[in-house]
């Protein structure tokens, strides 16, 4: 499969974009990021600054920045200028336009999205150019952020996920002598209230560029509003800025909570912190320990322009349990259980019911195609917890709703007729909602997925000190990627063979094919034979 591309000088921007050697670009950027990490660990701040400048002024980094904003989910969402880089010509010209000198970001376009509680969350949508500039500077800032990050911070960090945070909760709370009390932290409007002064004084990046982003303003209903605090919620670099704002809390708790008992023997008050973006918990041996921590927490946040919500910040006994990242964590008769929270189950079932009710006249196959991705996605998220019983209950609720859907379609038919039409014996189950069709003389069966079929697998947590930008951790992340892919390809020998044959790489972009990024099997004719490859979905769409 001839997929090698080279960077070349050409007068045709469309051809120039297609001729970019993405493997070479990724390699150049990765090398500079590794050097930034090395210099930062050695305390060579001048060298870090120099490498940041080199990276943000390189063609390779600019090309990757443009590629990311034109392939992510927001690629079809314009800013205030209405511009979208949908052509190869526009993309290549965008690379050439990313310059520090004379750069002036445009105001954000204010939109509102619904939160889980029904309230509206404000988002600021930057223009495509501003997104690309943020993506460019993020390439230089992210490696530094990883070096300085709290070890048990898991949100919006490369190679980390919600399941890592939940597994860390399980690690620190599951033992017999584990802490019994938990402080559930809630920060009032974290993104909206971060101090600009604190960011400009503490974020190790080009302060002129950062200040322009922070002060660019917001346009809503044709009116321009100044931004005096907070970071652009909706900006590519915003989650990293928020993370760096909250980093340091773990060290503060560690230094302030070394106590001595009466026998002059040091003991730990069992203070641990687990954070995912602005959601966090802090554990303690006693309720009094956590009450003493609250003033420290308030002071730490106040320095950054943030405020702890007194109403929503709770101190809970582990036997009563608490909700965190969609899971409920509690001890029952001394055994720690992490299972889907009642709120999460209700929200999911409401989504399922809405999908079914919105498609009353659709074909059965359409309903199955709409529901299967939801069922698989939700089950995969919660498969790391004690979720089997919940999965069974959810399956039953979905069955009841589909039975109502089928009865409504045929009000004059009996139950047996409806059951025979829509529900069939499949594998070991009698009541499987499925469609049978005959194509080319073969019977195709398309069943609805059962959540209970999802195997419960304890998540293998990332090592807290692991840094994906540090060359010293390269072999660790390669082993971790292999483990995840083996898990996702278990029982699919042909796919596993292709993955190994391709040396884990996508043949179009040269990047790793992992369980986290969507991929598919694509066919190509070579020397009169059909050859199959594993390819990233986004790469295939770009190269069609």
Go through each PLM region and give its residues:
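Charged boundary/loop elements
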Residues: 15-74, 139-155
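Conserved polymerase palm-domain catalytic core
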Residues: 97, 101, 148-152, 157-160, ...
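A conserved non-catalytic segment of reverse transcriptases
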Residues: 215, 304-378
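Non-catalytic, peripheral interaction segments enriched in hydrophobic/basic residues
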Residues: 363, 367-424
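Extended C-terminal regions of large enzymes
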Residues: 397-401, 406-497, 505
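Short metal-coordination and nucleic-acid-contact micro-motifs, chiefly zinc-binding Cys/His arrays
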Residues: 499-504, 532
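Histidine-centered nuclease catalytic patch
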Residues: 511-544
């Amino acid at each position: 499969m001839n997929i090698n591309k080279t960077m070349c000088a050409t007068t045709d921007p469309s051809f120039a974009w297609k001729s970019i050697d993405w493997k070479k670009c990724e390699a150049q950027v990765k090398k500079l990021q590794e050097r930034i990490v090395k210099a930062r660990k050695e305390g060579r701040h001048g060298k870090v600054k120099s490498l940041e400048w080199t990276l943000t002024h390189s063609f390779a980094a600019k090309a990757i920045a443009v590629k990311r904003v034109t392939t992510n989910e927001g690629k079809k969402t314009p800013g205030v200028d209405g511009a979208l880089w949908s052509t190869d010509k526009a993309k290549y010209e965008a690379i050439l336009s990313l310059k520090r000198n004379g750069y002036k970001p445009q105001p954000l376009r204010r939109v509102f999205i619904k939160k889980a509680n029904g309230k509206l969350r404000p988002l600021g949508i930057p223009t495509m150019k501003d997104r690309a500039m943020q993506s460019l500077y993020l390439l230089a800032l992210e490696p530094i952020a990883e070096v300085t990050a709290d070890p048990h911070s898991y949100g919006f960090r490369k190679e980390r996920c919600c399941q890592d945070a939940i597994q860390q909760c399980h690690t620190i709370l599951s033992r017999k002598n584990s802490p019994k009390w938990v402080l559930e932290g809630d920060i009032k409007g974290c993104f909206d209230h971060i101090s600009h002064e604190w960011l400009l004084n503490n974020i190790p990046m080009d302060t002129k560029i950062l200040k322009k982003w922070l002060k660019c303003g917001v346009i809503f209903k044709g009116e321009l509003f100044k931004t005096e605090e907070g970071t652009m919620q909706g900006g590519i670099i915003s989650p990293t800025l928020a993370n760096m704002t909250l980093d340091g809390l773990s060290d503060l708790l560690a230094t302030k909570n070394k106590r001595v008992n009466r026998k002059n023997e040091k003991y730990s008050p069992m203070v641990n912190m687990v954070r995912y973006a602005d959601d966090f918990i802090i554990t303690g041996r006693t309720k009094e320990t956590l009450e003493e921590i609250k003033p420290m927490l308030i002071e730490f946040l106040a320095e950054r322009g943030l405020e702890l919500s007194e109403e929503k910040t709770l101190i809970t006994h582990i036997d009563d349990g608490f909700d965190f990242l969609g899971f409920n964590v509690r001890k029952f008769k001394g055994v720690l259980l992490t299972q889907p929270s009642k709120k999460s189950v209700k929200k999911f079932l409401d989504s399922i019911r809405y999908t079914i009710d919105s498609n009353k006249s659709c074909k059965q196959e359409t309903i199955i195609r709409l529901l299967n991705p939801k069922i698989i996605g939700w089950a995969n998220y919660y498969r790391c917890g004690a979720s089997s019983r919940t999965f069974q209950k959810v399956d039953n609720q979905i069955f009841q709703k589909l039975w109502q859907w089928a009865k409504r379609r045929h009000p004059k038919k009996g139950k047996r007729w409806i059951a025979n039409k829509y529900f069939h014996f499949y594998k070991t189950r009698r009541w499987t909602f499925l469609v049978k069709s005959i194509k080319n003389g073969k019977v195709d069966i398309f069943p609805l997925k059962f959540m209970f079929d999802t195997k419960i697998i304890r998540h293998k947590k990332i090592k807290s000190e692991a840094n994906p930008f540090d060359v010293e951790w390269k072999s660790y992340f390669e082993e971790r990627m292999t483990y995840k892919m083996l898990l996702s390809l278990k029982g699919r020998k042909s796919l596993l063979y292709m993955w190994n044959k391709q040396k884990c790489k996508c043949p179009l972009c040269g990047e790793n094919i992992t369980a986290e990024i969507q991929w598919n099997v694509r066919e190509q004719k070579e020397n009169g034979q059909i050859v199959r490859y594993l390819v990233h979905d986004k790469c295939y769409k770009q190269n069609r």
